[in-house]
């Protein structure tokens, strides 16, 4: 019962869309109405408000970290509990019950989850994102590369293979890549927006 309640709680935590909440609180347009129409920090940055984008990034990462940390802190369900919380908070962000199941792509939330699972894993994955984003200026490309490397880091840095948490990390990576399928098409076509680029449609 504890595992079930923790999983539901993690999903509800993930369902809080900080892109929408922060934008509304700061009097900005709903991020689902412009740019990529994705409620995430990168799209909020297209509004021109860096503060809102940073708050969105921090909020989305924090909720991912919090959901997993709480399960670990109170020892709910061991590795299975951690894995379920990780997947649940991630799915909550992707398909938030509070926002008609129209969520983001999960990059910041996944980073928060990984930081809670293992700080070094989270930092290694975040560093991968930063390096790719710095050199290529594509948030989506950075996210895709980080998603590919996250489970690899998990295996080779920590030797985690056949356990629930490792499978959860792999599942999040696959889901994140799938959520970026339109970005993949635009990257291949040379139509993807760069970081900080304002755009009213597409992306």
Swiss-Prot record:
Q: Which reaction does it catalyse?
A: an acyl phosphate + sn-glycerol 3-phosphate = a 1-acyl-sn-glycero-3-phosphate + phosphate
Q: What is this protein called?
A: Glycerol-3-phosphate acyltransferase
Which GO cellular component terms are attached?
Answer: plasma membrane
* Keyword tags: Cell inner membrane, Cell membrane, Lipid biosynthesis, Lipid metabolism, Membrane, Phospholipid biosynthesis, Phospholipid metabolism, Transferase, Transmembrane, Transmembrane helix
- This protein's source sits in the domain of life called Bacteria
What gene name is listed for this protein?
plsY
Source organism per entry reads Burkholderia pseudomallei (strain K96243)
| Coiled coil (UniProt feature) | none
Q: What is its EC number?
A: 2.3.1.275
The pathway it acts in is: Lipid metabolism; phospholipid metabolism
Q: How does it sit in the membrane?
A: Multi-pass membrane protein
Chain segments annotated as transmembrane = 3-23, 51-71, 74-94, 116-136, 140-160, 164-178
> What biological-process GO terms show up in the record?
phospholipid biosynthetic process
Name the family.
Answer: Belongs to the PlsY family.
């Amino acid at each position: 019962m504890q595992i079930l309640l923790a999983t539901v709680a993690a999903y509800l935590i993930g369902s809080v869309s900080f892109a929408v909440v922060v934008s509304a609180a700061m009097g900005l347009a709903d991020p689902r109405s412009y740019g990529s129409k994705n409620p995430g920090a990168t799209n909020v940055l297209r509004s021109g408000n860096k503060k809102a984008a940073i708050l969105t990034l921090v909020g989305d990462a924090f909720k991912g970290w919090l959901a997993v940390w709480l399960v670990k802190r109170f020892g709910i369900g061991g590795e299975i509990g951690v894995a379920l919380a990780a997947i649940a908070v991630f799915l909550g962000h992707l398909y938030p019950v509070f926002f008609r199941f129209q969520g983001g792509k999960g990059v910041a939330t996944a980073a928060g989850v990984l930081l809670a699972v293992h700080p070094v894993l989270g930092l290694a994955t975040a560093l991968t994102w930063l390096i790719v984003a710095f050199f290529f200026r594509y948030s989506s490309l950075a996210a895709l590369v980080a998603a590919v490397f996250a489970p690899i880091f998990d295996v080779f840095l920590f030797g985690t293979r056949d356990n629930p948490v490792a499978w959860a990390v792999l599942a999040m990576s696959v889901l994140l890549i799938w959520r970026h399928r339109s970005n993949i098409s635009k990257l291949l076509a040379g139509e993807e927006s760069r970081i900080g680029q304002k755009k009213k449609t597409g992306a």
